[in-house]
């Protein structure tokens, strides 16, 4: 679980950013042809997404299907695939926003640092600072703003170890513990 939640977003961000910058001249050539820019970017995005999702399915999917072909394993695969696509989209967003390759890779690494590490610290700070107030809805909103945390919550609730997650786990078990709640979590990941 930790490998999927930490490494998959990092690889997706870095690979997506580097691919975009390395194929920048080819994209410019295609843009000079009578093709819509939306079509060009969507084709680039789909190509990178299919390649990285295939690599994820080969590297993680085969062992999970061999040794843990249950609901938890399939949820882990689904979350991993969604995180791959989400972070490739974020990589393309960062690469389109900056023309300099070094700055674009830096933006991608900062995005990963925020989503993987900093967001959890900000959540803890807010929860400890405002512990006297009801934070259920605010916690749900903050978790929805981070696809890595949302994926972690969906997989851990499927594993039924929410007692190990403390206050957040109890809250998530109440709000997302049912099949409808898990579907809402997957739906928010899809919106990402």
What are these regions (language model features)?
Residues 2, 47-103, 107:
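Secretory targeting signals
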Residues 8-13, 42-43, 71-76, 180-184:
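Short alpha-helical transmembrane interface motifs in multi-pass membrane proteins
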Residues 12-16, 25-26, 89-90, 119-122, ...:
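Hydrophobic/aromatic residues in alpha-helical transmembrane segments
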Residues 13-33, 44-45:
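Transmembrane helix boundary and interhelical loop/hinge segments in multi-pass membrane proteins
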Residues 34-46, 50:
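Amphipathic cytosolic juxtamembrane alpha-helices at the membrane-cytosol interface
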Residues 105-115:
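Central hydrophobic cores of alpha-helical transmembrane segments
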Residues 119-191:
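Terminal transmembrane helical anchor/hairpin motif
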């Amino acid at each position: 679980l930790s490998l999927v939640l930490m490494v998959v977003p990092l690889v997706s961000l870095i690979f997506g950013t580097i691919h975009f910058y390395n194929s920048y001249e080819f994209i410019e050539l295609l843009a000079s042809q009578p093709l819509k820019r939306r079509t060009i970017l969507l084709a680039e995005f789909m190509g990178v997404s299919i390649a990285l999702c295939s690599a994820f399915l080969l590297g993680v999917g085969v062992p999970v299907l061999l040794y843990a072909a249950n609901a938890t394993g399939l949820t882990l695969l689904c979350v991993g695939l969604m995180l791959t696509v989400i972070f490739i989209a974020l990589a393309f967003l960062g690469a389109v926003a900056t023309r300099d390759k070094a700055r674009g890779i830096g933006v991608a690494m900062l995005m990963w640092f925020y989503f993987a590490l900093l967001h959890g610290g900000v959540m803890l700070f807010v929860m400890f600072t405002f512990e006297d107030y009801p934070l259920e809805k605010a916690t749900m909103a903050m978790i929805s703003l981070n696809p890595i945390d949302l994926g972690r919550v969906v997989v851990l609730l499927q594993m039924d170890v929410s007692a190990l997650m403390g206050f957040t786990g109890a809250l998530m078990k109440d709000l997302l513990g049912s099949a409808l709640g898990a579907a809402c979590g997957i739906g928010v990941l899809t919106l990402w």
